From Swiss-Prot:
Annotated protein name in UniProt: Nucleobase-ascorbate transporter 7
Residues covered by region (Disordered): 1-20
Compartments (UniProt record): Cell membrane
Lineage of origin: Eukaryota, Viridiplantae, Streptophyta, Embryophyta, Tracheophyta
Regions that span the bilayer: 45-65, 81-101, 103-123, 143-163, 166-186, 191-211, 229-249, 295-315, 372-394, 398-420, 432-452, 471-491
Amino acid sequence: MAGGGGGGGGVAPPLKHDGLEPHPVKDQLSSISYCITSPPPWPEAILLGFQHYLVMLGTTVLIPTYLVPQMGGGNEEKAKMVQTLLFVSGLNTLLQSFFGTRLPAVIGGSYTYVPTTLSIILAGRYSDILDPQEKFKRIMRGIQGALIVASILQIVVGFSGLWRNVVRLLSPLSAVPLVALAGFGLYEHGFPLLAKCIEIGLPEIILLLLFSQYIPHLIRGERQVFHRFAVIFSVVIVWIYAHLLTVGGAYKNTGVNTQTSCRTDRSGLISGSPWIRVPYPFQWGPPTFHAGEAFAMMAVSFVSLIESTGTYIVVSRFASATPPPPSVLSRGVGWQGVGVLLCGLFGAGNGASVSVENAGLLALTRVGSRRVVQISAGFMIFFSILGKFGAIFASIPAPVVAALHCLFFAYVGAGGLSLLQFCNLNSFRTKFILGFSVFMGLSIPQYFNQYTAVNKYGPVHTHARWFNDMINVPFSSKAFVAGILAFFLDVTMSSKDSATRKDRGMFWWDRFMSFKSDTRSEEFYSLPFNLNKYFPSV
């Protein structure tokens, strides 16, 4: 009989630990070489900044490569769009690191905005335009108008303090699904893209693992050169290897898709880029506004806001900072809205969001310095103006970028799981909220994406394309679905007793709910130039 015996009611005898203790809970990671406020020496900081620039180039190039041909543009338009997105990303990264969250977060393009942007591209009012260049400009101006209106949502929600009040209800438990799927949820941009040219992508991921995980254990030294600069080493080697395959005629008789993925001379960016060009506002003409498209883009802006909140949290972990107070996250969201506004004004063709891959790079290098990311922003602006030189680096084959994503997205996902250390995993309430939100965060978007792939339109299919996007796009985001579900369940299923608060991990995060309740918050997140006196955080 189970649990029978002796009148003890099945109570197990106390276990002998023999000196075994659980790992200590840490609100700051101690194994980071340079934290948010401690910059490396200048030569090392410049190389690390260039490495961040290389990593963010992937998304910066892939998004225009996908969108521009459908807009009617050619290599010249694609090069200009890449330059503009790069230029605005540099500005946004500087603004975020100086006045926003002050975290070492790179602000770049986002895949979240792509479906709604594609809906604008396919709008019927552009189908009668025969001149490809005129069609490109007209569509770009429509995208600009939608982005300008969408930016208002993040600006108002962030600077009004509304997002601060929402984030105060966020616990470590509800943050886990959001942060974890902000990384793991991007798996389709990893190996599936890498496999389009396996002979280039596979060597890249193998070399990246060797340089970052194995060689440092074989060759021990104080400088930690190999794991800190693993991206530069591996990308240069595979890039040369891919170029040798290209000039050697390895892809001469292959299909178009293989040549596009594998060859180093197929991007068209070098030939399409001018030597020197400074992007400027309204370069494509005055923006046009369409109410439905603006509402659809605002819905996407809200999804991006939630995804970015999760990424900010994991960036703070990898920068060895304390959890950002709600007022700091709200401030960051407001400046991110300014970033979306700049994307609309300059005509970047995409919105601004926190770069998940660069967040993963912080974990790989174990350098969370704010100065490094500011240097990378300098590289973005510099190479966006010197078009030809920037295009050389931007011609890295997409499978090489995908190999980097495999590692960096995994780091971000693992950073989300690490928040479980604050929670009680023996609680069935914790198990339910965690398991259900993660499962549904994978299952619901899978249904929406699979339905769209088969039918060429989403489950919500009305005559109003903008309304379809307002429903279909949010439910196609894994981090959004998981984060919203976990947040809702955690808040509505909570009781006021201290045991439940402890299970949720709030005992650990309570001290960071107010800016002044922990002295480290002022060290990491106070505004520069004594601006805290005029814009105090609460």
